């Protein structure tokens, strides 16, 4: 999530504090939207266990929660300080705290699913935000804090505890996704652009999408096997579909923002994951309006995820 202090900056992008219609082209035909759970606070991030269940974070209410296959919502941890990115890895759920431009120093923590035990792995992080599990088991996380010198993207190896504070120095980054080749990742930052970063050359990011093709305040994201990227939009409450080869983009849904008097822009969508939906795949989306939604694609769209563990 981008801290509320970004509201002033958003006003420079949109005519008013209310969400204006995105100028990104629309491609919503054929997509079906349903609700998994609603009314559970400001949802910041999610991940799937691959078996119809999800782990979500609530940034304002400070929780890590579980959503089962029937939609039953249960808080597992409370009292967390601005929890953000979350990833399931075997018997563990990794998550970040301290998300925000001016938040207090944050942490990377590990929750053991079987016992509920929590282990603090890293402290003193500079506004940690997005989290990604790599095929080799390492974790990448983005940082957006401005209270200290920029730290870019960090890398942590759970098997040994090895930590690289600045794996990539690309600043003010947010979402993360693995590319289907397994040799690069995607990320975005406050310049409103999306980048590809080779895993073997983290200081060589290449911008692949942005204004004018994509007008967005990009948040978390996920890629498909065919290298299509789906990106949450924190400004307009959209999910944008991005062609990573050309930079062309379109919105499959918009307007997922807080209603009326509860608005506090930016307050749109925050994360998107591809997860099983019966024998097929669907997008699952969190938003600041407290709803976890399922987006089923048209028949001609293959959502097979890039991430092998899905």
Residue ranges and their predicted role:
Residues 30-37, 71-77, 116-122, 162-168, ...:
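A short beta-strand motif characteristic of beta-propeller blades
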Residues 37-54, 79-106, 123-142, 147-150, ...:
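Beta-rich, blade/repeat-based domains predominating
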Residues 56-74:
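Beta-propeller domains
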Residues 63-65, 106-109, 151-154, 193-195, ...:
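A short loop-to-beta-strand structural motif that recurs across blades of beta-propeller domains
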Residues 67-72, 111-116, 156-161, 198-203, ...:
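Short loop/turn segments that connect beta-strands within beta-propeller blades
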Residues 235-290, 296-310:
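C-terminal closing repeat unit and adjoining cap/tail of repeat-based domains
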């Amino acid at each position: 999530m981008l801290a509320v202090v970004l509201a002033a900056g958003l006003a420079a992008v949109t005519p008013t504090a209310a969400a204006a219609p995105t100028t990104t082209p629309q491609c919503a035909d054929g997509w079906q939207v349903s609700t998994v759970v609603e009314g559970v606070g400001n949802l910041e991030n999610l991940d799937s266990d691959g078996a119809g269940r999800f782990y979500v974070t609530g940034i304002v209410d400070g929780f890590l929660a579980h959503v089962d296959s029937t939609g039953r919502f249960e808080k597992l941890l409370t009292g967390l300080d601005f929890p953000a990115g979350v990833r399931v890895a075997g018997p563990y759920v990794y998550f970040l705290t301290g998300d925000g431009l001016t938040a207090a120093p944050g942490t990377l923590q590990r929750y053991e699913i079987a016992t509920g035990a929590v282990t603090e792995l890293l402290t003193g992080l500079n506004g940690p935000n997005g989290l990604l599990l790599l095929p080799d088991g390492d974790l990448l996380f983005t940082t957006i804090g401005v209270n200290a010198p920029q730290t870019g993207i960090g890398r942590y190896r759970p098997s040994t505890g090895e930590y690289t504070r600045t794996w990539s120095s690309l600043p003010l980054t947010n979402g993360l996704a693995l590319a289907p080749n397994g040799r690069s990742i995607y990320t975005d930052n406050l310049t409103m652009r999306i980048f590809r970063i080779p895993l073997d050359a983290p200081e060589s990011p290449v911008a692949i999408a942005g204004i004018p093709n994509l007008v967005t305040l990009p948040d978390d994201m996920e890629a498909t096997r065919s290298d299509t990227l789906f990106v949450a939009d924190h400004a307009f409450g959209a999910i944008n579909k991005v062609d990573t080869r050309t930079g062309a983009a379109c919105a499959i849904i918009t307007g997922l923002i807080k209603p009326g008097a509860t608005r506090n822009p930016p307050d749109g969508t925050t994360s998107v994951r591809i997860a099983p939906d019966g024998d097929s795949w669907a997008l699952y989306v969190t938003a600041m309006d407290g709803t976890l939604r399922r987006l089923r694609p048209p028949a001609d769209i293959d959502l097979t995820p890039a991430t092998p563990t899905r």
